[in-house]
Each structure stands twice: as C-alpha cells, then as structure tokens.
Amino acid sequence: MCIRDSVKIYGVLRTLTKVIGRVRPRFKFWLILKFPLYSTSGLKVGLVGCGHHAFSSIAYYLSTSTNAKIVFSLDIDPKASSSLAYAYNTLDLGGKYKISDSSSVDIVYISSNHATHTQYAIDFLEKGCDVFIEKPISINKQQLDLLSHAVRKSNKKVYVGYNRPHSPSIKIIKDSFIDNNTPFTLSCFISGHFIPENHWYRDPSEGTRIVSNLGHWIDLSIYILSWSSTLPEFLDVIIA
C-alpha cells in the first residue's frame, strides 16, 4: 500500500504512526499526539511486546483515544522496546522483566510473541492486574488449561483481542439479520498475506498461523452463528 492510499484510509497521523512503527527512528512521537501523556487521572497501563501492532495500534489508540497512561513497555528485542518507550514517553524495561514491575499499573496489554502470551497473562493475574491478551491466548491445550485455572483463581478481568465481531461491517450484517429461527450456513474463505520463510509466525513453537490467525475467524463464526436460536453441533475446518 502506498502512502497516499494509507492516508485516505487511516488519515495522516495514523499513517505517520505506521511509518514510524516500521522504521523506528528516535522520534519523540508523543509530542505531536493529542493526548496529555503526563496525565495521572486514567488507567495506568503496562505494555508487553513492542512490535508493529503494539506501536501503531495499541499504543497509538491508548494515547489518542483514552485518558490512559502507558507506564512501562518491555520486549525481548531491545530496539523495539527502547524505540516504543522513546516515542510514547514510557519507562523502557527492555527484556529485563520482573513481576514487581507491574505494581504501578492497573492493566497490562500483552502483545508479545504468541508462545509467551499465556505465561505473561498468568504472571500479571497473580500479581493482581487486569490483562488484555492479544490473540492467541494460548498456543496449545496445556497452556489453555493453565490459563483457565489462573482465570478461575483470580478476581481480575481478562480481555481478549478477538475484535472481528465489533467491526462496522459485521454490525451492519447483524442489523439485517431479522429471523433467528431460519437455518443458515456460514462459509469463510481466508487468504493470508505473504510472509517470508524465516518469519517467526512460521515457527511451530509459536502456534503457526492456524492458531494465530484462524482463531479470529472461528471466533467470528461462533458470534454470527449465535444470532440463531441454536448453535451448531460442530464446526468443520478445512486447511488447503
């Protein structure tokens, strides 16, 4: 996508955010954002994982659309962590994570590499923080069982980054869905964009793109099918 098209879709400021998130110059991005980043009136947020999505989406919208304050950021990649911290005026913890670092925050956003989502979530729940877990919440059943146990033990809130049901197009479709007793079939054809052979998504230990991305569409399918009076007895997933 060229810059001109990006500006049409996202606007100038968000496009600038995406560019900075890719090249990561030492740029005090917070100076041009609308939000007063030194505010202490809102939620205090910790950010785990400082990749492009965290930089151009999570940190951006927390800084422009809420009164939250990003207190700290950490990533195993020192450049990713330091560049996001510099851009958004947060404390850079680098990869030296200690559970005590969560004592100053209300909620932690977890958008690190996929295999680490579960353990980070468990650690912060046990520390008494609400957590927002980007998809996937777990990469295998063992992790899911551990996370489920931690959620049941904790009285803190857990949010999950399956956002497709909240898209404007799905809301339009739902408004047009009148009769919930009529049977219907839902089919999704998904074509993933190209990623290089050495991309970390392809590492089997990270859950692969099936766990990482297909979960979005399974979640959306269940949501749409729930509009009917009964849920289906099974889902059939074909990987070609």
Regions found by a protein language model. Name each.
Residues 71, 106, 184:
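Conserved acidic residues
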Residues 55, 81, 117-118, 140-141, ...:
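Short, well-ordered alpha-helical microsegments
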Residues 88-132, 136-147:
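Beta-loop-alpha module in the N-terminal Rossmann-like domain of NAD(P)-dependent dehydrogenases
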Residues 7-88:
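N-terminal Rossmann-like dinucleotide-binding module
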Residues 1-6:
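Conserved small/polar residues in nucleotide/adenosyl-binding loops
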